[in-house]
């Protein structure tokens, strides 16, 4: 596999060198991207599940960016099986990509521990890998691009303290166990809440980033505990589930999400959600593609292995700062901050 990838890269570089000679002779320079379809770079992009709007957006922006660059056969890989993210399915997809002989892989692993061996197998086959959103620390990947999810959790915690000046009991809905964003967002939130005494997390349970599970978890929590002063969720999908229950039961409580999905921006605008955290998933996926392509074509290894975009808190006061604000119909001028 390494030989196949290197042959393709050598051929592309040969075309570039020939172009330089042609340019010196006054001839038109060819694109640095291979023109013929059979010379295209084959890049696979794997996500835990396209049943999550977050990953749909990430995939769409990556595919759009690959098309803009040109010379790339973009291969989308959906890791869900039977309607849910599956490490087994994602592993099988990677095995198929090794057999197919792709040139590079961008992946957001469903479970970082479960996918680590499969990702290492891809690397051992001579295929460079860039992780996006979810980092795998024990595997020798080319690079990782993500958001600072610990800081995102801190933003949620600081906002809770701001809107609850007299304190209060808060429910927390955590994300999928084993997913680094879920782990990091909880850590950031816990760090801020633990540093003061007024706001307390009295219920902290996983709803696995899923709206339907959030409905069940929140209903169960309400049945056994006093009404919370606020609810903080590790993603917007869970916040939507909480909002659904709150509306059905006539509760008026601040609900804080994470991801800045268009539906969340609309909900913040109409008052059914209080805030969300923007982590610029489109910025993450396009930067991951850029790093991989630059390595494949130019042998450029990033100076830093990890690239983290700085998340921002989105409330009704700054809706236009969200990456998908225009899509949501609330304006937009966001620029990802590294």
Model-derived features: where do they sit?
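N-terminal secretory signal peptides
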Residues: 1-10, 14-32
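C-terminal segment of N-terminal export signals and the immediately downstream linker at the start
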Residues: 27-43
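Hinge/cleft segment of the Venus flytrap/periplasmic-binding protein
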Residues: 39, 173, 177-181, 192-193, ...
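Extracytoplasmic "Venus flytrap"
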Residues: 42-61, 65, 69, 75-91, ...
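Short, solvent-exposed amphipathic alpha-helices that sit
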Residues: 54-68, 152-159, 180-199, 213, ...
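Hydrophobic alpha-helical segments within soluble ligand-binding/sensing domains
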Residues: 89-90, 145-170, 184, 213-215, ...
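Hydrophobic alpha-helical
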Residues: 95-99, 103-123, 189, 203, ...
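Flexible loop/hinge segments that line or gate small-molecule binding clefts
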Residues: 104, 112-151, 162, 169, ...
